[in-house]
Amino acid sequence: MTIPSPFAYDGLLYLNGGRGKSLFAIKPGAIGDLTPKEGKTNEFLAWSQERSGTYLPTQVAYDGALYVLSDTGILSRFDAKTGAMSYRSRLEAGGAFTSSPWAYNGRIFCLSEEGKTFVVKAGEKFELLHVNPLDEMAQATPAIVADRLLIRTETRLFSIREKVR
C-alpha cells in the first residue's frame, strides 16, 4: 500500500512506492507504464532507490536534497537530482512517525507520535540539533500558514512563530 503523496520539485516528479519499495524520480513528459524492470532504468526515470520507500510520511525536498522519514524513525537524505544517498540515520530507537517531515531555515523537522520534534541540520551529514517534547501524542503533519506553524496533538493545537525582533 502506498500512502505518501507524489510531488514535483526542481523539474522532477517524486514518487514513493511504499514501505520497503523503491523511491523514484521521474522526468517530465513521461507517459504509460513507467515501471522499470528489476535493476534497470528507462528514458523517463531520472533515478530510483530500492527499499527506500516509506509507509506513511511523504518525503520533503529542501535545498537540493530529498529527506525521507520512515514510520520507524529512520531519516535518509538523497541528492534530489542524482538520488545519491548521503546518510540513513535513526532518530530514536522504538520511535513511531506518522506525520511527514517539514523544512525551514536550514533545518529538517520530524514529529514523532510521542509528540517529540526532532530537529536535524539540513546538509550532507546527519546532525541532530534538538529534541523538543510536546508531551502528548501527535499524528498529524503540521501545517504552515503564513508566518505560523500549526501543530495538532491529541488534545491541543499549538501555533508557533518566530519572535518579532
Task: Report the location of each language-model feature.
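Noncatalytic, solvent-exposed loop/strand surfaces
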Residues: 1-165
